[in-house]
């Protein structure tokens, strides 16, 4: 039964991890961060949906009263 050749695994793992770290650094350096973050008012974040003003009730078929 032939043995598994693991002589190149160290090089492969090392180069892969180096590549992942390098790409992560590139992503972080090109990302634009806000220079002066300020808290937002929570009231301005409310979305107005058309169904908010309506009262609706949905019934499941098994929850109906059976007489």
From Swiss-Prot:
Organism: Glis glis
Subunit structure, interactors included: Component of the ATP synthase complex composed at least of ATP5F1A/subunit alpha, ATP5F1B/subunit beta, ATP5MC1/subunit c (homooctomer), MT-ATP6/subunit a, MT-ATP8/subunit 8, ATP5ME/subunit e, ATP5MF/subunit f, ATP5MG/subunit g, ATP5MK/subunit k, ATP5MJ/subunit j, ATP5F1C/subunit gamma, ATP5F1D/subunit delta, ATP5F1E/subunit epsilon, ATP5PF/subunit F6, ATP5PB/subunit b, ATP5PD/subunit d, ATP5PO/subunit OSCP.
Family: Belongs to the ATPase protein 8 family.
InterPro entries per UniProt: ATP8_mammal, ATP8_metazoa
List of residues that carry N6-acetyllysine: 54, 57
Gene symbol of the encoding locus: MT-ATP8
GO BP terms in the entry: proton motive force-driven ATP synthesis
Keywords for the protein's UniProt record, in alphabetical order: Acetylation, ATP synthesis, CF(0), Hydrogen ion transport, Ion transport, Membrane, Mitochondrion, Transmembrane, Transmembrane helix, Transport
GO molecular function, one term: proton transmembrane transporter activity
Pfam families for the chain: ATP-synt_8
Compartment(s) of residence: Mitochondrion membrane
Topology class, membrane: Single-pass membrane protein
Domain of life per record: Eukaryota
Name recorded for this polypeptide: ATP synthase F(0) complex subunit 8
Function: Subunit 8, of the mitochondrial membrane ATP synthase complex (F(1)F(0) ATP synthase or Complex V) that produces ATP from ADP in the presence of a proton gradient across the membrane which is generated by electron transport complexes of the respiratory chain. ATP synthase complex consist of a soluble F(1) head domain - the catalytic core - and a membrane F(1) domain - the membrane proton channel. These two domains are linked by a central stalk rotating inside the F(1) region and a stationary peripheral stalk.
Residues annotated as transmembrane: 8-24
Predominant location: mitochondrion
Residues bearing PTM N6-succinyllysine: 54
GO terms for cellular component: mitochondrial membrane; proton-transporting ATP synthase complex
